[in-house]
């Protein structure tokens, strides 16, 4: 039987086993290929202290352009010990790059000549959203990571978009090197169920697994690149999601499920049906009584998400939802194409308070059109929603650092760059390729990096004053300190 090594590259957190590994294992099982798991994050975790993780974070996210040679050598040694020294055991080396933040480490590791030697008798396959991201700024030419890897013969196959069908073709000896889904016509309902058997759950902080109910998004937010990977929103039948939850519970004993969806209520009707079905299963079978789930969510008007929908979420076991509120300024959210109002936020949080569903709110500081008045709206929003933090309904806010431009997002399209007159200090004609924190706007000249950092620190002060917990606050402040050196 052929054998595959399934690898997840940094940086993903160590809360839950990576969804990509479960997906790949499910496809391997359907195609009679044995496999082993390797979450490279776990290997590095045993070698890095928190401060070293932050150094890597700054490098991967573009806060710093380079990484210390000694630091890179530690990463390379870990790669040699965990991958290269064992590579003779495998027919397929399958690597997942979750996002843009994996570009630099993928380029560093996959160009290792001991790994990609021309006499290799194994196939190197790479996939994940990060493969489609532009590497301009990290290598010569404007091309994607996948294209660069193929051109340099560092890999044998690159998979874009959904990997289930195309990965199966590779396992069946497809000769095609760059595989793309055909207009996303594959039916999510037909894909194999992810398989997490063999994962060492003790390596992770939460006894949980990921589950997928949909791919893509019903919104086209200007700062998000999800459309690049999945241009069409699709969802699975509610019945199949419930059956998968039951299977993982009985196979693995897990009771907590984390949705990978960009938003679990993308299809309101299917989400409502899922909650009803799961609640019915829990009522019938006491084994399932502790089943719970968390996921990303979008605030919707009352006429779309009725009170009965929140009630159904409660009985199905929804414990926490993460929402990209982004700004308490309705004007800024409209610029972002978020498509919900302050009234919708009020309705949503009141329903969550009624049913005990906690919220994590994600925010963006320094959107290109953000004015001082919009900043004051953010401060007023902190005060407005602080009472919900006292009850635990507003579990935490994450302000992040400040807005950065990332290739592949609508903000980096030429008409949007022209609209906001975006340029890089010291280079008036174009923005820094790759990822830019240091951009400036010709139509909003007061919104310098220094001013964005000031506003971010101001929001930290007010959030602390009103006793709203902040996610990763210390980490963000340390990054801001590093960014301030460029301001």
What residue ranges belong to the model's regions?
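A structural motif corresponding to the C-terminal end of an alpha-helix
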Residues: 31-33, 153-154, 251-252, 285-287, ...
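Flexible glycine/acidic-rich beta-alpha junction loops that bind and position SAM and/or redox cofactors
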Residues: 43-48, 131-136, 219, 268-269, ...
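Acidic, low-complexity intrinsically disordered segments
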Residues: 2-253
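Structural recognition of alpha->loop->beta junctions
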Residues: 141-166, 312-320, 379-400
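Radical SAM [4Fe-4S] cluster-binding motif and immediate context
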Residues: 190-359, 367, 380
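Radical SAM enzyme core and accessory elements
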Residues: 2-9, 14, 23, 29-30, ...
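Short helix-capping segments at alpha-helix termini
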Residues: 32-33, 114-121, 279-289, 387-391
